Amino acid sequence: MSTTRCQVVGFLLSILGLAGCIVATEMDMWSTQDLYDNPVTAVFQYEGLWRSCVQQSSGFTECRPYLTILGLPAMLQAVRALMIVGIVLSVIGLLVAIFALKCIRMGNMDDSAKAKMTLTSGIMFIIAGLCAIAGVSVFANMLVTNFWMSTASMFTSMGGMVQTVQTRYTFGAALFVGWVAGGLTLIGGVLMCIACRGLAPEETNYKAVSYHASGHNVAYRPGGFKASSGFESNTRNKKIYDGGARTEDEGQSPPSKYDYV
């Protein structure tokens, strides 16, 4: 899968995951009344994160919001917080991912900046997906625990008679929507992180070669090549031409016709 395709697929999956998280958080059917062995069928009860509802057999539904915060169970408040954090992180990740798409050019933004933004949005999507999955799983675990506790105390035998003492609740549709939405957001974040590797520019590594100066200097002399030490001092020789004195700074004598024989 190419980098652009991987990035776009991850972006679209994250959008679907965000939409699913919002829908699941707003749904009222997080827990529904268990109708198995329930003698009362005229009333159907279900509860969500924000309110509880009662549906009559006639089709009339009445919902009542939770008017208290401190009076709610701590687990329910934790589920609320996890879902809200997941939604907020997904929204921020989408805003970052829009500018990080390779098919969109924003001024002089280079591939290195897009790679960093893609990685940032991918990490946000992964955390958001984990928050959504964790929130739904915590609520589901709370339902399972209450279900079996209710089952243990639901029937009391007295003289061979069975009496229902409390209502049991089971999984609602919102739990499955939340699990799917969290999974889509998580997969989208992973794909964004994978696309980051293709956007990052490749670094060319050059091997450093150290230069070592030679221990001896080779000086040219008219009579041929002769290795001389670098610490030798140059002497000044005086030559007399046509009766005049002339000083020469180089430490060689002019070649004669016998030097090349």
UniProtKB/Swiss-Prot annotation:
Keywords: Cell junction, Cell membrane, Membrane, Phosphoprotein, Tight junction, Transmembrane, Transmembrane helix
UniProt protein name: Claudin-18
Organism of provenance: Bos taurus
Biological role: Involved in alveolar fluid homeostasis via regulation of alveolar epithelial tight junction composition and therefore ion transport and solute permeability, potentially via downstream regulation of the actin cytoskeleton organization and beta-2-adrenergic signaling. Required for lung alveolarization and maintenance of the paracellular alveolar epithelial barrier. Acts to maintain epithelial progenitor cell proliferation and organ size, via regulation of YAP1 localization away from the nucleus and thereby restriction of YAP1 target gene transcription.
Membrane topology category: Multi-pass membrane protein
Subunit structure: Interacts with TJP2/ZO-2. Interacts with TJP1/ZO-1. Interacts with YAP1 (phosphorylated); the interaction sequesters YAP1 away from the nucleus and thereby restricts transcription of YAP1 target genes. Interacts with CLDN19.
Location(s), subcellular: Cell junction, Tight junction; Cell membrane
Region called Required for role in regulation of RANKL-induced osteoclast differentiation, residue ranges: 195-261
A GO CC annotation given for this chain: plasma membrane
